[in-house]
């Protein structure tokens, strides 16, 4: 039996295996709202161009709103035989208002531009949702930054002790990463602002339509100027997948450090019991599962990006069925990102900063060595490389004594070039605030950085 909406050209029915293999309804039904939104805009445009009558438009809009209500209330029956969400909605619409009017909705439109429009609307909405979540996470980081300007901790390079910084300075580094993530999403949202609706299969339509009107109704800033590009383009999906992948690069780095810093070896932070789990055999265990899962999910969102890049890499123009595989990975990445950002934000709100442990850790690894070298250059006019060698000898002597250079009582006993003033440098807070360059760890600089971020999120 031939009951597919495209079956007029065929003399026989599709094999049941093909129907099941070909169908995307279980995935793309996520787009029901966008599909109805796009159809209402398309029908409105058709009526304005005299292609639909006013009473036909009214019936279509009323019918589509009923379909939306049925889906939202769980009353809509999804049938795999309908193939995709577009056909499922159109079939139900025709059942409600009759095929004579319902069948007119698809005038001057193809599923090719229809799905591209639906998907782009979903992507645009996802950008906005992710920007909001990133804003909230930045705000949480800013709250920590405001409180911990004088909470001193070691910074690391190569995971070795480097220089003293504040926890404020540390967490602001991640806040600025997230600021770039927001800007990246904003740029991608700008690029996604062109409507493919009305491109039809690939070459446009012989009807005198008004693509600018439907684009305006749907909130696009303009139309895609080439119909073939309109239905072939999935850059907007790749952009969002890439943006999410970079977000996870940043959150994964943060989570890795939260895992390290909450371990017994560091004990810089304590993660709330609400966001930790135990062991089935070891009673003492408190595991940072949230951080580990976000770190693990990073591979998942990377995979979704690589998957679509591979799908698109050699596709001829215009639409190909391969592109049906573009949605599942995107839906997964968006949900994964939203879920992860929400729980990471709440977890960060509740972490406890162990100030004393952070400060004690600064007394290992000779964090003040660079300050001593800079002092020799600045006060004794010694070339930096020579100063580097002199301070390296101080470090070696301290290690022989089994102490950190911050614990040395008299530097002049190691090298007479050091005077009493040099001893003032052996202070972590002094080191922190001695930095004068823009973007440094000093309290004055940290306050400027906080202001930059506050002004940025105010505009979101």
From Swiss-Prot:
Statement: the UniProt record of this protein carries the keyword Amino-acid biosynthesis:
yes
Q: What keywords is this UniProt entry annotated with?
A: Amino-acid biosynthesis, Arginine biosynthesis, Cytoplasm, Lyase
Q: Could you tell me the Gene Ontology terms of the biological process aspect for this record? A: arginine biosynthetic process via ornithine; L-arginine biosynthetic process
User: Reaction catalysed by this chain?
Assistant: 2-(N(omega)-L-arginino)succinate = fumarate + L-arginine
Q: In which pathway does it act?
A: Amino-acid biosynthesis; L-arginine biosynthesis; L-arginine from L-ornithine and carbamoyl phosphate: step 3/3
Any GO molecular function: argininosuccinate lyase activity
Cellular component (GO) terms are:
cytosol
User: Its Enzyme Commission number?
Assistant: 4.3.2.1
Location, primary (coarse class): cytoplasm
Q: Does the keyword tRNA-binding apply?
A: no
The listed locations are: Cytoplasm
Highest taxon in the source lineage? Bacteria
The entry's family comment says: Belongs to the lyase 1 family. Argininosuccinate lyase subfamily.
Q: NCBIfam families, from UniProt?
A: argH (TIGR00838)
The molecule here is called: Argininosuccinate lyase
């Amino acid at each position: 039996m031939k009951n597919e909406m495209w079956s007029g050209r065929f003399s026989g029915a599709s094999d049941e295996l093909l129907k099941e293999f070909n169908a995307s309804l279980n995935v793309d039904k996520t787009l029901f709202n966008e599909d109805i939104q796009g159809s209402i805009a398309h029908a409105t445009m058709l009526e304005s161009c005299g292609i639909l009558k006013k009473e036909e438009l009214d019936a279509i809009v009323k019918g589509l709103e009923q379909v939306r209500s049925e889906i939202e209330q769980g009353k809509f029956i999804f049938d795999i035989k309908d193939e995709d969400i577009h056909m499922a909605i159109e079939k139900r619409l025709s059942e409600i208002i009759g095929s004579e009017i319902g069948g007119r909705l698809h005038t001057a439109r193809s599923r090719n531009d229809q799905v591209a429009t639906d998907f782009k609307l979903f992507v645009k909405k996802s950008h906005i949702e992710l920007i909001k979540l990133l804003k909230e996470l930045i705000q949480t980081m800013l709250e920590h930054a405001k409180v911990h300007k004088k909470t001193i901790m070691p910074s690391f390079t190569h995971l070795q002790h480097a220089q003293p910084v504040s926890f404020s300075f540390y967490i602001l580094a991640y806040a600025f990463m997230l600021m770039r993530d927001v800007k990246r999403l904003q740029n991608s949202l700008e690029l996604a602002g062109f409507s493919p609706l009305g491109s039809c299969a690939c070459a446009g339509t012989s009807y005198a339509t008004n693509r600018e009107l439907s684009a305006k109704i749907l909130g696009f800033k303009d139309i895609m100027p080439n119909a073939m590009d309109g239905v072939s383009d999935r850059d907007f999906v790749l952009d969002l997948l890439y943006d999410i992948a970079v977000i996870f690069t940043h959150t994964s780095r943060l989570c890795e450090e939260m895992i390290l810093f909450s371990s017994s070896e560091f004990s810089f932070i304590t993660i709330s019991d609400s966001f930790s789990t135990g062991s089935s055999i070891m009673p003492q265990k408190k595991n940072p599962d949230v951080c580990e899962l976000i770190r693990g999910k990073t591979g998942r969102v990377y995979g979704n990006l690589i998957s679509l890049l591979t799908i698109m890499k050699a596709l001829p123009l215009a639409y190909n069925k391969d592109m049906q595989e573009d949605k599942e990975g995107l839906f997964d990445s968006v949900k994964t990102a939203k879920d992860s950002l929400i729980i990471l934000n709440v977890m960060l709100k509740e972490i406890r900063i162990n100030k004393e442990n952070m400060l004690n850790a600064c007394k290992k690894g000779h964090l003040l060595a660079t300050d001593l070298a800079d002092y020799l250059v600045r006060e004794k006019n010694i070339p930096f490389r020579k100063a580097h060698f002199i301070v390296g000898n101080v470090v070696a002597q301290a290690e022989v004594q089994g102490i950190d250079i911050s614990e040395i009582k008299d530097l002049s006993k190691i090298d007479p070039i050091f005077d009493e003033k040099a001893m003032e440098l052996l202070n972590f807070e002094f080191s922190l605030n001695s930095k004068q360059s823009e973007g440094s760890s000093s309290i004055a600089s940290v306050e400027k950085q906080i202001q930059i971020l506050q002004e940025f999120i105010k505009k979101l």
